[in-house]
From Swiss-Prot:
The keyword Transferase applies. Its cofactor is Mg(2+); thiamine diphosphate. Binds 1 Mg(2+) ion per subunit. Binds 1 thiamine pyrophosphate per subunit. Catalyzes the acyloin condensation reaction between C atoms 2 and 3 of pyruvate and glyceraldehyde 3-phosphate to yield 1-deoxy-D-xylulose-5-phosphate (DXP). It comes from Nocardioides sp. (strain ATCC BAA-499 / JS614). The lineage of its organism: Bacteria, Bacillati, Actinomycetota, Actinomycetes, Propionibacteriales. GO terms for cellular component: cytosol. PROSITE patterns: TRANSKETOLASE_2. Homodimer. The gene is dxs. Pathway: Metabolic intermediate biosynthesis; 1-deoxy-D-xylulose 5-phosphate biosynthesis; 1-deoxy-D-xylulose 5-phosphate from D-glyceraldehyde 3-phosphate and pyruvate: step 1/1. This is 1-deoxy-D-xylulose-5-phosphate synthase.
Length: 634
């Protein structure tokens, strides 16, 4: 039995000796490595915050004091010392420990976040609430790993700076991606003095006395203050924070637990918001991660614990996009690539190697990415903005007002669209086809296979008077499904028997729809499967196909509310097509973490479930009654 097994809550940390705490840190790293090697997850960020997290929980009293993690993937250590060590082997498994903070798991988790740059706003609100209610509680926000490249973090800092009474401690986890390395001992000594309340009292006294001296007093104080600030600014990167009016402690070695505890205790005693700047190394304590040049094992696939070698993985959708965008870049000198701190994950790294001058990583700034793309389009370029589907939500206003309103030719490529699975509710890209339906002029494509991804990407970048979107899911693509016929701009994938059922298969659900068709054909039901390719706007040819069939069924890997099926039904209503309609999509709920296949089964987006429902509907129609839950044009 290890020491970690005896830690049921953060309170158990406070009685441990230095030697025991070192042992505990070692056990935590070992468990992190072994678990992520099998389950996958975020390893590098968590290896880098072991001592930092232990220090936070020894100095503060969670859950009375609230700890908010920005980009919650760095909360694994927090979970381990907050009672979840025994169940950590279920990390990212259905019904197991989430890869992000989860209110359902523990009272120590308050924010279920995986979107970056939000923690400071949560913390600002919490701290203000406790101040108003007269509660003596601290709020600790841990932010870093690039999250300070997001504008929302600076909006929060701008407001935090004027909330002088808020008991808010902001721990900047600087792993080399946001700030310069630590400077030295003098900076630490000066910042220790700077945040000492006694120093503040003395400074106020000196200010009052000097200002009372006629003529020279105010000037003397300003000179003294400028000298002190100038010396500190020369030694440590706190100038920007102090210019905002925030107290600053650091830099401090984030892997030195005792030093972290000392500065956190100083910050806790100060009556107001404080920045604690901790220098850490991503992947710390695991040599393969520290030597991994790309991202220090940020989120590796399954790997060998001894060597760090990742196990072979198959081809994914991202690889197809990555190859095709390079081909397009060679043919189109006006093509530029933009991403928001996701160069490798979205597959733009290959484009960057070929065309570095035409590739832009804007940091965690999706809003800026969209509007900058509009500017590039106005300047004669064609930008391709590659993001995860869930992160486009953050830039909706910019897509609508900055890109679409100005009829800019910008292509958005949405990776990890639809159900993503293991990363939980906030990573599912299940809203894009709903929110984008309201954007005038925007065209949206959903490829069913690799060949269609290449085809539709080429078509998208040819549009220079409106935004286009190409979206595809996470994981491995299916084999190419060739069309048997064409209807307008849509592909007919299956045409069997009589015109009983028209199945409209959106994007990656094409494979599912073909399977459904085989099951229906085996039961004597005639079926046509159509892939719209471009799902917005609705192709008039699909309206005519719907008019010819007895039942229309739409299948999409997107929310049912406001999605492609809902818009198709609305279009049929407007065209006077009264064919009964069945919509299959993602219900209007947040989906917990599990494998994609398990989630699709849970929500009924499997060939078996869909075919069964269609058989039931056709039976009702054959008997001369329309099922109550089949949507019907009126």
């Amino acid at each position: 039995m290890g020491l970690l097994d005896s830690i049921a809550s953060p309170a158990d940390l406070r009685g441990l000796s230095d030697a025991q705490l070192e042992q505990l840190a070692s056990e935590i790293r070992d468990l992190l490595i072994r678990t992520v090697a099998t389950n996958t997850g975020h390893l590098g960020p968590n290896l880098g915050v072991v001592e930092l997290t232990l220090a936070i929980h020894r100095v503060f009293d969670s859950p009375r004091d609230r700890v908010v993690f920005d980009t919650g993937h760095q909360a694994y250590v927090h979970k381990l010392v907050c009672g979840r060590a025994a169940s950590f082997g279920t990390l990212r498994r259905e019904g197991g420990v989430s890869g992000y903070p989860s209110q359902a798991e523990s009272p120590h988790d308050i924010v279920e976040n995986s979107h970056a740059s939000t923690a400071l706003s949560y913390a600002d609100g919490l701290a203000k609430a406790y101040t108003i209610r007269g509660e003596d509680r601290h709020v600790i926000a841990v932010i870093g790993d690039g999250a300070l490249t997001g504008g929302m973090a600076w909006e929060a800092l701008n407001n935090i700076a004027i909330a002088k009474a808020s008991k808010l401690v902001i721990v900047v986890n600087d792993n080399g991606r946001s700030y310069t390395p630590t400077i030295g001992g003098l900076a630490t000594a000066l910042t220790s003095l700077r945040t000492n309340p006694r120093y503040e009292n003395v400074l106020d006294l000196v200010k009052r006395r000097l200002n009372a001296v006629p003529g020279v007093g105010p000037a003397a104080y300003d000179a003294l203050h400028a000298m002190k600030k100038g010396l500190k600014d020369a030694l440590a990167p706190q100038g920007l924070f102090e210019d905002l009016g925030l107290k600053y402690v650091g830099p401090v070695d984030g892997h030195d637990r005792a030093a972290m505890e000392q500065v956190l205790a100083q910050a806790k005693r100060f009556n107001g918001p404080v920045i604690v700047h901790a220098i850490t190394r991503k992947g710390y304590g695991y040599d393969p991660a520290e030597r991994h040049e790309a991202d220090q094992f940020h989120a590796p696939g399954p790997f060998d614990v001894q060597t760090g070698a990742e196990k072979p993985k198959g081809r994914i959708w991202t690889d197809v996009f990555s190859e095709e965008i390079v081909h397009l870049g060679h043919r189109r000198k006006d093509l530029v690539g933009i991403t928001a701190a996701m160069m490798h994950p979205v597959g733009l790294d290959a484009f960057q190697k070929h065309f570095p001058e035409r590739t832009f990583d804007v940091g965690i700034a999706e809003q800026h990415a969209a509007t900058s793309a509009a500017g590039l389009a106005m300047g004669g370029m064609h930008p391709v903005v590659a993001l995860y589907g869930t992160f486009l939500n953050r830039a909706f206003d910019q897509v609508l007002m900055d890109v679409a309103l100005h009829k800019c030719g910008v292509t958005f490529v949405l990776d990890r669209s639809g159900v993503t699975g293991d990363d939980g509710a906030s990573h599912n890209g299940m809203w894009d086809m709903s929110i984008l339906q309201v954007v005038p002029g925007l065209r949206l494509a959903a490829p069913r296979d690799p060949a269609r991804l290449r085809e539709l990407l080429n078509e998208a970048v040819e549009v220079d008077d409106a935004p286009t979107v190409v979206r595809f899911p996470k994981g491995s693509p299916p084999e190419d499904i060739e069309a048997v016929d064409r209807a307008g701009g849509a592909d007919i994938l299956v045409r069997n028997g009589t015109k009983d059922v028209l199945v409209v298969a959106v994007g990656a659900m094409g494979t599912t729809a073909v399977d459904v068709a085989q099951r229906l054909t085996a039961q004597g039901i005639g079926v046509t499967v159509v892939d719209p390719r471009w799902v917005k706007p609705v192709d008039p040819a699909i309206v005519e196909l719907a008019r010819e069939h007895r039942l229309v069924v739409s299948i999409e890997d997107n929310g049912e509310t406001g999605g492609c099926g809902a818009v198709l039904l609305q279009t049929l209503n407007a065209a006077g097509v009264h064919t009964p309609f069945r919509l299959h999509g993602i219900p209007q709920q947040f989906l917990g973490h599990a494998k994609r296949a398990a989630i699709l089964e849970r929500i009924g987006l499997t060939p078996q479930a869909i075919a069964l429902r269609i058989v039931e509907d056709m039976t009702s129609l054959t008997e001369g009654r329309s099922p109550l839950d089949v949507e019907q044009a009126t």
